[in-house]
Amino acid sequence: MARLLDFNNIEVQTLDIVLRDDARTKVHLRYPTEGLVQELIRISPEMHKVLETGDEESLNLTYDLVARIISCNRDGIKVTGDELRNKYKMDFEMIIVFCSTYLDFLNELTNAKN
């Protein structure tokens, strides 16, 4: 007897976020590439230090990484680190909250698969 795995019937989990622009843009985030996950895990412990020191290069790298993660979405919306700071009015504390929430989301997905 043949078995059928129909990917059209699989519900893909997303983390839905609402950005702080005037339109309150809603974005449905998907699981990112493995490389982005590794980068996020690598920088997470350093984020509070960046907040304390205000190191501009580290701030820029963090905003750019978060922008690449947010750009992994079902909506086809692409954002940059500069847009997160300006258009979407995200300060660094919001970036930390986002990263923490996003890592929780990834852990839930990973645990659900096991």
Language model: regions and residue ranges:
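Extended acidic low-complexity intrinsically disordered regions
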Residues: 1-11
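Short acidic-hydrophobic surface loop/beta-edge motif
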Residues: 11-22
